[in-house]
Swiss-Prot record:
PROSITE patterns: CADHERIN_1, CADHERIN_2. This is Protocadherin alpha-8. It comes from Homo sapiens (Human). PXXP repeats lie at residues 774-777, 799-802, 832-835, 873-876, 891-894. Residues 30-133, 157-242, 243-350, 351-455, 456-565, 581-678 form the Cadherin domain.
C-alpha cells in the first residue's frame, strides 16, 4: 500500500512538472526541440508550423523562413508539411566544444503581419569520441631512493564528449611496484598519479613498462591507452617538494603583460647541487599555457606573457616541475589552476535586419520599420545589453525578446517637414564602466499627395491696353506644391464660365505647364472694361489636389474713336447747317450749338471746340465755346458785317494722337423784321429740308420730356429697390465704372456713352474704378504716384442689374441737349463718406467767358444722354474750376496721387461747364425765359466785348 501511494505521488509530481514546463514555454514565446548529434540528413526534429499555430497553407504566402546567425544550414523546414528536419551533419563537439549545454538558436519569421518566433534546438551528445592521451608514451624517471607510496603525476586523457560520455575511469596494467591512484575532486579535474608500492632497485629492474587505460562512461564504452616508461634513477634520493600539491589563482583578463600570477616555493632536503632547485613547466602542459604564461627558473615566479581573454579561455591548468641539480636530478610537482575573471572589455554588437524602407508619410502608428538584435560576449552584468534610440524622433524601440528589438513608428510623419531621418541606435552593457556601440539607420519618408498647389496670393490684378494683338501674353500665374515628384507637378487650366453671350475660353487661354495667360483676341475697352475669371492649379498626384486663383483683367482705354457729331447733322445744303441771326442781337447771343460725343474715356474723350479762321472773312463776329460748342456773337452786329458767314468748327479730343471732326455752320444775317419772312422763304426754297428737320426736332423735344419723366420715375424705383434688396452675387453685366481724370484746369467725373460691360466671375461689378490717362498735357503739374498697388475692389457693394429699359433710342440721343450740369456730382469719390469734389453749376445760357479765362474740362466724351449720380452727401467745400485737388484717392487702393498746379487766372470761365444729369428745357420754358436771358446777355455782352479774342 505504501509503495502504491508513493508511486502515485511521484506521478503527480511528474505531471505538475510537465505542466509548469509547458506554461513556461508558452509564456516565453520560444519553442524547444532536441536532436542527437551525428543525426542523418532528413532526421525529424519537430512539427514547427503546428507548434507555432500556423496553417500549412499560409507558410508560402506569409514568406515563412528560418534565420540563424551561424548555423543556418544545419536545420531546415519543409514548407509542404511544416516539419523541422536535419539538413546536414551536426557535430556537437565542433559546434559547442566542451560546453555542457549546446543549442542551435533559430529565428522563424513570417510576414503579413510580421512575426518573429524563437526556436532552440538542443543538440544531445552521443558517445562518439574515445578518450585520447596527448602523447603515445609517457616517460617517468624515478630515483631508486624514493620511498614507497611516492606519487608521480600522469597526464590524464581527454574526451571530447560531455556529460556521462566524458566521465573517465583509469586502470593500470598489473605491476608489482606501481599502482594507480585517481584523486577525483570533480569530473573536470581528476588528478591521475602513479604510486610506488615499494622501494625500487635499479640493479634489479632499471626500467618498468606499464599501460594506462582510460575508459569513458558512454554506452558502449570507449577506451584509450598510453604506455608508461618508468626509468629508475640512482643516488639522489630526495626530490623537491611544494607546500601544497595544487594552487588556485584568480586574475582579471585585462591584466597587463608581466603581471605576477603566483610565486612558487619548493624545498629539497638534499645539500649542494642535489638541493638546488630549478622551476619549469611540465612537458605535458598545453601550448596555450606556454603562449600566455612564463616561469622564472630560479625564483618560481609565474608571470603573464600574452593577452588573456575570458571569452576564449577562462581556466588554465599549469603543471609545474621543481627539479634539483643532483645526479640524477629529482623533481617535485604541483598544479596551478589559473581562473580568468571577466572584465567588461567587449563592446556590444548591433545587427539590423528586415528593413522596411522607405516609410510612407501616412504610415500608421506601430508600423515595424526594422528588427534589431544585440549581443555582448562578456558574461554576467557585463553581457547584459540595453538598447535605446536617439530622442526627438517619431520612432521607438520595442523589446520583443531577450536582446531583440523592433523599431516601430511612434508618431505621425510629414515628408514636407522632414524627408529623411538619420537614426542612431545605441546598445549599452551593464558593466562598470559600461561600454556601448552605435549603429546608424537612414529612414527615408515616401511622399504622399497631401498638399494642394498654393498661389502666392488669392487674387491678381492685371492691366491690359485695348486693341492688343491676338495671342499676346498678359500675365503668368504660378503655384507651388510642397510635395515631391509627380505629386508636385502642377498643371494650370481655366475655370470655364460664360462672359455674356460667349464662353470665357474665347477670350482667354492658359498654358497648361507654364501658367502663362494669353488674350486670344483683341480686347475692346468700350465693350469690356473688366474681365474677372479664375485659373485652377492641379497636381498630378492620386487623388489630385487643386486650388484656384482669381484674376481681374482691367482693359485700359486707347484713343481709337474719333469724335462723332450729333448736331449739326450732315445733310441739307452741302452738308452744312444754316442759321438765321437778326442783326439786332447783342454780344453773347447763342447762334447755334455743335454737339459731339467720343466713345473713348478720360482724356481720349475730352472734347474741345475751335473755330477755324476763314480767309474770306478775317474778322468774324462769332466765337465758339472751348468746351460747350456754343457759337455766339462776340459783339453787336452792324451793317459792315458780311450777310453770310461760313463757320468751320473743329472738334478735337485730347488723346495721343488727337482725333478730330469738323462741323460746318452757315450763318445768315437778316433784319429783325425780315427774319420771319426770310425764314419762310428759306424754308420753302433752299432750306426746305431744314424746315422738315426743325419740325422733327420739335417732336423729339416733346418725346425727350416724356422719356425724361419716365426715367426719373424709373430711377426712383430702382434706388428704392436697391436700398431694400439684399446683395446678390455679381455676374457679367453692363456696368459703368466712374472714371476720374485730372488736367491743368481741374478734375471731372465722366460716364461713358455706350453701355459697357464689367465681367466678374464671383464678385459684383466694380463701380468705383479710378484710372489716369497716360497722355496728360505737357502743362499739367507734376504727378506723384506712390508704389504700385494692386487694385483692390470692395466686394461689399453689390448693385442690382440696371433696368434694361433705361436706354435711349437713337432718335432721342440725336435730339438731346448736350449741356449737362456738374451740379451735386462728385468728382472724386473713394466710397461713401469719402472725399467729394464739387463744381459750381452753370447754365448753357451763361455768356462766354472773357478772353484768357480758363474753363474747366467739360464735354469729356459725355453726350447729352449721359447721367451721373452722386453717392453720399456732398462736401460743402467747393474748389474753383481752375483749381486742382491736392490728392486723388483711388477707391480700394492705398495709392494717393497728388496733383497741384496754380490756376493761370484768378477768374473762372463758368460758361464752358457741362452739367451732367440735367434734362434739356423744353422750348416753351425757353420762350418764357428768353426775354430775361436776352436782357442779361446784352448787359454782359457790352461789358465783355472789348476783352473778347474771337
Amino acid at each position: 500500500m505504501d509503495y502504491h501511494w508513493r508511486g502515485e505521488l511521484g506521478s503527480w509530481r511528474l505531471l505538475l512538472l510537465l505542466l509548469l514546463l509547458a506554461a513556461w514555454k508558452v509564456g516565453s514565446g520560444q519553442l524547444h526541440y532536441s536532436v542527437p548529434e551525428e543525426a542523418k540528413h532528413g532526421t525529424f526534429v519537430g512539427r514547427i508550423a503546428q507548434d507555432l499555430g500556423l496553417e500549412l497553407a499560409e507558410l508560402v504566402p506569409r514568406l515563412f523562413r528560418v534565420a540563424s546567425k551561424r548555423h543556418r544550414d544545419l536545420l531546415e523546414v519543409s514548407l509542404q508539411n511544416g516539419i523541422l528536419f536535419v539538413n546536414s551533419r551536426i557535430d556537437r563537439e565542433e559546434l559547442c566544444g566542451r560546453s555542457a549545454e549546446c543549442s542551435i538558436h533559430l529565428e522563424v519569421i513570417v510576414d503579413r503581419p510580421l512575426q518573429v518566433f524563437h526556436v532552440d534546438v538542443e543538440v544531445k551528445d552521443v558517445n562518439d569520441n574515445p578518450p585520447v592521451f596527448r602523447v603515445k608514451d609517457q616517460k617517468l624517471f624515478v630515483s631508486e631512493s624514493r620511498m614507497p607510496d611516492s606519487r608521480f603525476p600522469l597526464e590524464g586523457a581527454s574526451d571530447a564528449d560531455v556529460g556521462a560520455n566524458s566521465v573517465l575511469t583509469y586502470r593500470l596494467s598489473s605491476h608489482d611496484y606501481f599502482m594507480l591512484d585517481v584523486n577525483s575532486k570533480n569530473d573536470e579535474n581528476k588528478l591521475v598519479e602513479l604510486v610506488l608500492r615499494k622501494s625500487l632497485d635499479r640493479e634489479d629492474a632499471p626500467a618498468h613498462h606499464l599501460f594506462l587505460t582510460a575508459t569513458d562512461g558512454g554506452k558502449p564504452e570507449l577506451t584509450g591507452t598510453v604506455q608508461l616508461l618508468v626509468t629508475v634513477l640512482d643516488v639522489n634520493d630526495n626530490a623537491p617538494t611544494f607546500e601544497q600539491s595544487e594552487y588556485e589563482v584568480r586574475i582579471f583578463e585585462n591584466a597587463d603583460n608581466g603581471t605576477t600570477v603566483i610565486k612558487l616555493n619548493a624545498s629539497d632536503p638534499d645539500e649542494g647541487a642535489n638541493g638546488a632547485i630549478s622551476y619549469s613547466f611540465n612537458s605535458l602542459v598545453e601550448t596555450m599555457v606556454i603562449d600566455h604564461f612564463s616561469i622564472d627558473r630560479n625564483t618560481g615566479e609565474i608571470v603573464i606573457r600574452g593577452n588573456l581573454d575570458f571569452e576564449q579561455e577562462n581556466l588554465y591548468k599549469i603543471l609545474i616541475d621543481a627539479t634539483d641539480k643532483g645526479h640524477p636530478p629529482m623533481a617535485g610537482h604541483c598544479t596551478v589552476l589559473v581562473r580568468i575573471l571577466d572584465k567588461n572589455d567587449n563592446v556590444p554588437e548591433i545587427a539590423l535586419t528586415s528593413l522596411s524602407l522607405p516609410v510612407r508619410e501616412d504610415a500608421q502608428f506601430g508600423t515595424v520599420i526594422a528588427l534589431i538584435s544585440v549581443n555582448d560576449l562578456d558574461s554576467g552584468a557585463n553581457g547584459q545589453v540595453t538598447c535605446s534610440l536617439m530622442p526627438h524622433v517619431p520612432f521607438k524601440l520595442v523589446s520583443t525578446f531577450k536582446n531583440y528589438y523592433s523599431l516601430v513608428l511612434d508618431s505621425a510623419l510629414d515628408r514636407e517637414r522632414v524627408s529623411a531621418y538619420e537614426l542612431v541606435v545605441t546598445a549599452r552593457d551593464g558593466g562598470s564602466p559600461s561600454l556601448w556601440a552605435t549603429a546608424s539607420l537612414s529612414v527615408e519618408v515616401a511622399d504622399v499627395n497631401d498638399n494642394a498647389p498654393a498661389f502666392a496670393q488669392p487674387e491678381y490684378t492685371v492691366f491690359v491696353k485695348e486693341n492688343n494683338p491676338p495671342g499676346c501674353h498678359i500675365f503668368t500665374v504660378s503655384a507651388r506644391d510642397a510635395d515631391a515628384q509627380e505629386n508636385a507637378l502642377v498643371s494650370y487650366s481655366l475655370v470655364e464660365r460664360r462672359v455674356g453671350e460667349r464662353s470665357l475660353s474665347s477670350y482667354i487661354s492658359v498654358h497648361t505647364e507654364s501658367g502663362k495667360v494669353y488674350a486670344l483676341q483683341p480686347l475692346d475697352h468700350e465693350e469690356l472694361e473688366l474681365l474677372q475669371f479664375q485659373v485652377s492649379a492641379r497636381d498630378a498626384g492620386v487623388p489630385p489636389l487643386g486650388s484656384n486663383v482669381t484674376l481681374q483683367v482691367f482693359v485700359l482705354d486707347e484713343n481709337d474713336n474719333a469724335p462723332a457729331l450729333l448736331e449739326p447733322r450732315v445733310g441739307g445744303t452741302g452738308g452744312a447747317a444754316s442759321k438765321l441771326v437778326p442783326r439786332s442781337v447783342g454780344a453773347g447771343h447763342v447762334v447755334a450749338k455743335v454737339r459731339a460725343v467720343d466713345a473713348d474715356s478720360g482724356y481720349n474723350a475730352w472734347l474741345s471746340y475751335e473755330l477755324q479762321p476763314a480767309a474770306s472773312s478775317p474778322r468774324i463776329p462769332f466765337r465758339v465755346g472751348l468746351y460747350t460748342g456754343e457759337i455766339s456773337t462776340t459783339r453787336v452786329l452792324d451793317e459792315a458785317d458780311s450777310p453770310r458767314h461760313r463757320l468751320l468748327v473743329l472738334v478735337k479730343d485730347h488723346g495721343e494722337p488727337a482725333l478730330t471732326a469738323t462741323a460746318t455752320v452757315l450763318v445768315s444775317l437778316v433784319e429783325s423784321g425780315q427774319a420771319p419772312k426770310a425764314s419762310s422763304r428759306q424754308s420753302a426754297g433752299v432750306l426746305g429740308p431744314e424746315a422738315a428737320l426743325v419740325d422733327v426736332n420739335v417732336y423729339l423735344i416733346i418725346a425727350i420730356c416724356a422719356v425724361s419723366s419716365l426715367l426719373v420715375l424709373t430711377l426712383l424705383l430702382y434706388t428704392a429697390l436697391r436700398c431694400s434688396a439684399l446683395p446678390t452675387e455679381g455676374g457679367c453685366r453692363a456696368g459703368k465704372p466712374t472714371l476720374v481724370c485730372s488736367s491743368a484746369v481741374g478734375s471731372w467725373s465722366y460716364s461713358q456713352q455706350q453701355p459697357q460691360r464689367v465681367c466678374s466671375g464671383e464678385g459684383p461689378p466694380k463701380t468705383d474704378l479710378m484710372a489716369f490717362s497716360p497722355c496728360l498735357p505737357p502743362d499739367l503739374g507734376s504727378v506723384d504716384v506712390g508704389e504700385e498697388q494692386d487694385l483692390n475692389v470692395d466686394h461689399g457693394l453689390k448693385p442690382r442689374q440696371p433696368n434694361p429699359d433705361w436706354r435711349y433710342s437713337a432718335s432721342l440721343r440725336a435730339g438731346m441737349h448736350s449741356s449737362v450740369h456738374l451740379e451735386e456730382a462728385g468728382i472724386l469719390r473713394a466710397g461713401p463718406g469719402g472725399p467729394d469734389q464739387q463744381w459750381p453749376t452753370v447754365s448753357s445760357a451763361t455768356p462766354e467767358p472773357e478772353a484768357g479765362e480758363v474753363s474747366p474740362p467739360v464735354g469729356a466724351g459725355v453726350n447729352s444722354n449721359s447721367w451721373t449720380f452722386k453717392y453720399g452727401p456732398g462736401n460743402p467745400k467747393q474748389s474753383g474750376p481752375g483749381e486742382l485737388p491736392d490728392k486723388f484717392i483711388i477707391p480700394g487702393s492705398p495709392a494717393i496721387i497728388s496733383i497741384r498746379q496754380e490756376p493761370t487766372n484768378s477768374q473762372i470761365d463758368k460758361s464752358d461747364f457741362i452739367t451732367f444729369g440735367k434734362k434739356e428745357e423744353t422750348k416753351k420754358k425757353k420762350k418764357k425765359k428768353k426775354g430775361n436771358k436776352t436782357q442779361e446777355k446784352k448787359e454782359k455782352g457790352n461789358s465783355t466785348t472789348d476783352n473778347s479774342d474771337q
